[in-house]
Structures are given as C-alpha cells and as structure tokens.
Amino acid sequence: MSLSAKDKATVKLFWGKMSGKSELIGADALSRMLAVYPQTKIYFSHWKSCSPGSPEVKKHGKTIMMGIGEAVTKMDDLERGLLTLSELHAFKLRVDPTNFKLLSLNILVVMAIMFPLDFTPMAHLAVDKFLCALALALSEKYR
C-alpha cells in the first residue's frame, strides 16, 4: 500500500499537531498493547514492571514515538530510511513483526482518544496507511 502525496501531507500535518504529546501517546499505546496482548510482554521480561505508567513503559513509549517521528521525515523511502531499526528489530531484538501491527492499532486508538476533532476519517486513513508502511519497512530484514 503506497502513500499518496495527500496521505503524506495529512500525516505530516497530524504529526505536527500531536507531536507535543507524543510521549504520552507512546506510553499509553504501549501500555494498552501490553495489557490487551499480554504475550508481547515477553520482549520486556528484563523490565522491573510492564504496568501502565511504569518508568520503563514511559521511556520505551517515548523511544517508539521518536522512531515514528523519524519515519515521518523519511516517508519517501521508509525502507532505506529505517534500515538500521529494521536490522535491530530483526537480528538483535528478534521481535515478531506481527507486533508492529498490534502496536499500530493501539497508537491509532490513543490518537483518536486524544485528538477527537483532528483525527478525522481522512487523518485516520492516512495515519493507518503510514503505520502499515512503517511496519512493512521495519519487517524488511525478516525476509
């Protein structure tokens, strides 16, 4: 699924509106993923706590959203732009790529909750397409 010029512009516009709350979005989305899909906790067994609001969840939520923010700037070539992150997740962290989609779903939920007026159906569509493209780019090294 490719991103049109309109999709890219919509993602950039929405990211600009929500980026000030990206840490909160990341922490909430990660907390939701860990609660709704408890099997994902296996990747974080070294943490003291996977509970919502724990320092580890907040920190990793911030890291995730910083990575997504970087991806927003590399939308024209996500595969090449995220090569290092793809290699990290495939070879070192060994994250099942299915989890990228699970996290994306939770990010969409949190964005809709936090930005009900800005997260229009068109914004939802564009951000969803972007997160799908991002997940695909991160999965590239698994092939």
UniProtKB/Swiss-Prot annotation:
The keyword Protein biosynthesis does not apply. InterPro entries: Globin (IPR000971), Globin-like_sf (IPR009050), Globin/Proto (IPR012292), Hemoglobin_a-typ (IPR002338), Hemoglobin_oxygen_transport (IPR050056). This is Hemoglobin subunit alpha-2. GO terms for biological process: hydrogen peroxide catabolic process. The modification N-acetylserine is found at S2. Red blood cells. O2 binds at H60. Heme b binds at H89. Residues 2-143 form the Globin domain. Belongs to the globin family. PANTHER family: HEMOGLOBIN FAMILY MEMBER, HEMOGLOBIN SUBUNIT ZETA. Hb 3 displays a Bohr effect, which is enhanced by organophosphates, and a Root effect, which is enhanced by ATP. Involved in oxygen transport from gills to the various peripheral tissues. One of its GO terms (molecular function) is metal ion binding. Keywords: Acetylation, Heme, Iron, Metal-binding, Oxygen transport, Transport. It comes from Boreogadus saida. GO terms for cellular component: blood microparticle; haptoglobin-hemoglobin complex; hemoglobin complex. Hb 2 is a heterotetramer of two alpha-2 and two beta-1 chains. Hb 3 is a heterotetramer of two alpha-2 and two beta-2 chains.
